[in-house]
Amino acid sequence: MTDTQDKNYIIALDQGTTSSRAIIFDRDANVVGTSQREFAQHYPQAGWVEHDPMEIFATQSATMVEALAQAGISHAQVAALGITNQRETTVVWDKETGRPVYNAIVWQCRRSTEICAQLKRDGHEGYIRETTGLVTDPYFSGTKLKWILDNVDGARERAERGELLFGTIDTWLIWKFTGGKVHVTDYTNASRTLMFNIHSLQWDDKLLQILGIPRQMLPEVRPSSEVYGHTKSGIAIAGIAGDQQSALFGQMCVEPGQAKNTYGTGCFLLMNTGDQAVKSSHGLLTTIACGPRGEVAYALEGAVFNGGSTVQWLRDELKIVNDALDTEYFASKVKDSNGVYLVPAFTGLGAPYWDPYARGALFGLTRGVKVDHIIRAALESIAYQTRDVLDAMQQDCGQRLSELRVDGGAVANNFLMQFQADILGTCVERPQMRETTALGAAYLAGLACGFWSGLDELRDKAIIEREFSPQLDETQKEKLYAGWKKAVERTRDWEDHEA
């Protein structure tokens, strides 16, 4: 706890995949200052994605200065700083100079596909799943780190001599902000590395041995809400969470069975499972979330590959809408989709199908089908895919969803939100505060330093702007969903491949 009596603001740093942002909140959790800076994406080969860690730090530092200036406040008025970040992205740097030995390898980067294939051939897949809650995939940090050690000249030897440090983006930023004094991460970010035992809450020696990672490179793992250190200007760094877990906390989904969906290019669904690390039989990830006081809780996570990107396809490739915002108007012009289903399996199907060979398709076309029906079917596909994942979550954990809390760009679409409630048969709650990811980091930092007293105070600030209640009867709902399931089956295993 720190004395926050005269300090009336919390800064949240939201370090994302394409931009760095800073958002300043007051005691009522209102936004009083913001700044955002984009940075370069590097694509050295097909399927490879990199960022410059120094540019990430520079843009993130600049946004903090700019947000403070916009709000007209000084560092001395800030009680604490919370960090939320793109997860899995991997940085390795020299402990003495603070210079990265290679660009940050981004979560989207697929360069370690062959490393993952070798892990599977060597029979490690089951142990990885059991220990980390994750699947053996290039998405996660461990194989990215192995690639750097194997491919950057001298990196492995330097790491073994204790000269190099590893971190996800939160760790890198904190190390830089504290002038190299603090090398730390939180449980949520550690749980995405493929090196962390989510049951013992320790780095896993067997996994480090399998991947060939020297343990001394790794940061200390701490709870998501505590004071880790101070910036050079004296601000307490007091909260860390990966972006999706931060949004879950920002939505106050801290009890078992509470869930949120972030509607972006794809959709990220997380359901809090409390102190139970639920093993999924539907290919969902088991991950660490934040409990009521920022302590360890568990969650199930599932991703929908194509959400907002389906609407972008209507706009950019089919050119049947000029603006994503127009889809609500066109979808509402017709009473239903006229039997049309769009399955947007452009890059295969994610949870719970896991079919990389599925391909997108339109079903139910007749001469009576208009553009409006196709636009409506595209929006409905986002809601159907969300139900696919939530049904799997409910089956895995035996918890009935109480309500779905939503955030992300597409939640402004009232048609989509209403249809989501209809097809789930569950209330959908849209918060007044849309900055839920940054808010989660601010809450974690504010709780750690006594800026806010506890969960009850935070719940009072969680104003629901609109609640969408289900309006379809059970028979109608299940008939529509059965049509979706039938359409999905027809898209399965479409692309030719070797068995």
Curated annotation (Swiss-Prot):
Query: Any keyword Kinase?
Result: yes
Activity modulation notes: Inhibited by fructose 1,6-bisphosphate (FBP).
Sites where the protein binds ATP: 17-19, 265, 308, 312, 409
Which is one Pfam family of this protein? Answer: FGGY_N
For this entry, list what GO says about its biological process: glycerol catabolic process; glycerol metabolic process; glycerol-3-phosphate metabolic process
Positions that bind sn-glycerol 3-phosphate: 17, 87-88, 139, 243
Its function? Key enzyme in the regulation of glycerol uptake and metabolism. Catalyzes the phosphorylation of glycerol to yield sn-glycerol 3-phosphate.
Give the protein name, as stated in the record: Glycerol kinase
Q: Which organism is it from?
A: Pseudomonas putida (strain ATCC 700007 / DSM 6899 / JCM 31910 / BCRC 17059 / LMG 24140 / F1)
Q: Which gene encodes it?
A: glpK
